[in-house]
Amino acid sequence: MGAPRLIHVIRQIGALVVAAVTAAATINAYRPLARNGFASLWSWFIGLVVTEFPLPTLASQLGGLVLTAQRLTRPVRAVSWLVAAFSALGLLNLSRAGRQADAQLTAALDSGLGPDRRTASAGLWRRPAGGGTAKTPGPLRMLRIYRDYAHDGDISYGEYGRANHLDIWRRPDLDLTGTAPVLFQIPGGAWTTGNKRGQAHPLMSHLAELGWICVAINYRHSPRNTWPDHIIDVKRALAWVKAHISEYGGDPDFIAITGGSAGGHLSSLAALTPNDPRFQPGFEEADTRVQAAVPFYGVYDFTRLQDAMHPMMLPLLERMVVKQPRTANMQSYLDASPVTHISADAPPFFVLHGRNDSLVPVQQARGFVDQLRQVSKQPVVYAELPFTQHAFDLLGSARAAHTAIAVEQFLAEVYATQHAGSEPGPAVAIP
């Protein structure tokens, strides 16, 4: 077989392989093809890109086919276009699902808060004179949004260097003498990585634009550090915010805590263990209460292995995070599980999870919410989003923008309930 013929055959085989990969990527977005082992990491990443950005995915698929179609034989070209057509239908439906995610979020809020709930936050807190709504969503904008809002960065709240730094997001014209509500953001990263910059930008930029102060923290990671160092740092940062946020125009009496993945776990645990001395060594008297919790795709039960834990999670916890076998020290795993600490005094919760989550099974959220609703006296809102993967809110997709608005509405209801009878001050622009 001559070189030209060999190149021709390779080109045809390559086109069929690309068509198969295209089809698999679209199918994976609807139903993850792997939930175990390292393959699940690829399933998650590809699913995240396809479900949150289906139209750019479609454009790249069709563009590649257009560029190569003339060099394909008629049968191969026909198969490639047929597969592309079915993939296009699937991707267009995913785009529609993302743009209409507000329907599921609205239904969740109506169910958890009642149909008479607030649907806007106007008039609840003092807003900057130029404050509006969140900017147009998009992944490119989210890459630079930090520069628009983070005006106080790398503030130390503890003794462990960069691991104990936090950033404060606010509009530059926010009244520093005011009492803006505060969002406290904890990054995810399997307790081993993650940074205060790069996560929850759609939510923080949306709330900062509306007059909130958002605090994003770092905390100590494993394997260099061992549980419960992570939650101790979260509590220490909370204590710092309570003591100092008024210097930046924030209200220490209204703090909503949030985070995704490991941050979802830590935010829930912090919300359910206010002033717990086990997690506040050396600062037991500090106030670490929060007024609301909004965890995203978190791990809520370290002991539920059969149907609600990724197979790689327990080895991670035993070898790198807790560093003890679960069977030898079950109490540590129970203490680290937010579900263990649910009580009637739990703050209002808004739990969000993707139904297609390949890394943290949705059963974690379902079980946690069921327990919360049975015990807590406060509202519990649960949004389970179809065709949605882990870390869906990382960049500025349509679904992430809808989610930011839904969180605003939830927090507006909580804020209004806790501030009934009070009036916000006038909007003030700072020159």
Curated annotation (Swiss-Prot):
It comes from Mycobacterium tuberculosis (strain ATCC 25618 / H37Rv). One of its GO terms (cellular component) is extracellular region. Its EC number is 3.1.1.-. It comes from the Bacteria. Its main location: membrane. It is found in: Membrane. Belongs to the 'GDXG' lipolytic enzyme family. It is an enzyme of class 3 (hydrolase). The keyword Transmembrane applies. Keywords: Hydrolase, Membrane, Transmembrane, Transmembrane helix. Disulfide bonds: none annotated. InterPro entries: AB_hydrolase_fold, BD-FAE-like_dom, GDXG_lipolytic_enzyme. The chain crosses the membrane at residues 7-27, 38-58, 75-95. It is a multi-pass membrane protein. GO terms for biological process: symbiont-mediated perturbation of host innate immune response. GO terms for molecular function: hydrolase activity. This is Probable carboxylic ester hydrolase LipM. The active site is at 261, 357, 390.
